[in-house]
């Protein structure tokens, strides 16, 4: 099953759950329709989540935690969840949808994503949208590299990006 990106609609019934991963603490955010956010602790661009209720038994949070554990254990390469990115402009949503198309174990450059979106001069804007991806790992922004193949920034930290790419067999 491919990742489904649904339209964002902020609802009063949004829930959050902190989880532990091999790369540190994350917070997951979901509503009744799917996963909306996944941020590492101290990651750049985390919105305020203080207004959200804790949802330890909420279906999409539990399913997201389960699939993420399978990913880290090497038993999952693709997530099967409805993804509803928290916030973002129409352009950012297009970029985030493009991230969902980058296969496990592969890379794409900012310039390749810009060309894919029909905006070959927009690599810098692509980079800014990638940096604000609200669904770390689930929308694989860690698979985006510079045009020369160099590892560039990751809102969760470059060390985490390296670890994720190693987990996927992209780096030795």
Predicted segments, located by residue:
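Basic nucleic-acid-binding alpha-helical/helix-turn surface characteristic of O6-alkylguanine DNA
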Residues: 1-121, 167, 171-172
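Regulatory, non-catalytic segments
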Residues: 124-133
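…primarily DNA-binding HTH/wHTH and HhH modules…
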Residues: 147-172
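Short Lys/Arg-enriched helix C-cap and helix-to-coil transition segments
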Residues: 137-144
